[in-house]
Amino acid sequence: MRELIPYFINGISVGGQYALIAIGYTLVYGILRLINFAHGDVFMVAGLVMVYTTTAMPFYLALPLVLIVTVVLGFLIERVAYKPLRTAPRMSVMISAIGVSYLIQNLAFYITGGVPQPVSNPIPWISENVAVLGTSTKRVTLVTPVLTIVLVVVLVYLINHTKIGMAMRAAAKDFETAQLMGIKINAVISMTFVIGSFLAAVGAMLYFTNYPSVAITSGGMPGLKAFVAAVFGGIGSIPGAVVGAFIIGLCEEVIKGLGYTTFSDAFTFALLIVVLCVKPTGLFGEKVTDKV
């Protein structure tokens, strides 16, 4: 059992990183009933921007720039790819999302030449090793779950106690009625993408601190697992996305600790199939009348 302690610690950290990505999926779905397939690629872009900026400028300038670039990217994706299709059939919007995903990957391929970019200048302090319960790990492993919980608390407060948050809840509850009540739907949707992109950028900086390089496909698997976490917890539910992410992160790492490393990824997608068969609404999800 003692041998599993490092895997439990890593699992909590990985779960926190998945949670930051999963919230982006669940926020967008809550309002637009859309799966933003480009969200994992936004996460990847944040990693690439971190690699380039941290080697070119001081960290106190580089890290805010990562957040700004990622947020602007998320905003532009919504305005260019989704806003013109607001009244279009949902399938058209989904196809647009897939197209945006491939566009971002190909632009990243053009910039990087398809070569993984090494994380040669990791974020100081959180990239240092520390001893925890008799095992050595990077400080980012401990920082990630704490920072995730803090950001989730701030987000929940924003949604429940601010005007923009109440507008987001109204739009999620009934999109058409919110429009008739005078809520600026376009501003609400843009803010949703901004928040999701911001959290994805934070998750990327934490995630890639533990990895030697960033490739154009680096957002694929974390994005898919975060999506599974959102579905498992109940897509559209922020607490559900967070709980689902931590459960998946812990299970994956414990499976690795038990010696079934090659099965850890398969477990996540097997879980998705089981959830969709047994409880399609997820742990905290609610039934909806509309169907895709």
Predicted regions located by residue number:
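Membrane-embedded helix boundary and interhelical linker motif in transport proteins
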Residues: 9, 31-76, 80, 85, ...
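Alpha-helical transmembrane segments within multi-pass membrane transporters and channels
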Residues: 58-100, 107, 243-248, 279
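Membrane-interfacial amphipathic/re-entrant helices at transmembrane-helix boundaries
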Residues: 1-20, 49, 60-61, 88-93, ...
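Helix-loop-helix "hairpin" substructures at the membrane interface of multi-pass membrane proteins
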Residues: 14, 133-214, 238-243
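Transmembrane helix-bundle core of multi-pass membrane transporters
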Residues: 84-85, 90-161, 188-191, 212, ...
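Transmembrane alpha-helical segments in multi-pass inner-membrane proteins
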Residues: 18-20, 57-68, 193-200, 206-270
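Short, non-helical or kinked segments that cap or interrupt transmembrane helices
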Residues: 16, 25-47, 87-92, 164-167, ...
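Hydrophobic core segments of alpha-helical transmembrane domains in multi-pass membrane transport
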Residues: 47-52, 67-73, 100-108, 147-156, ...
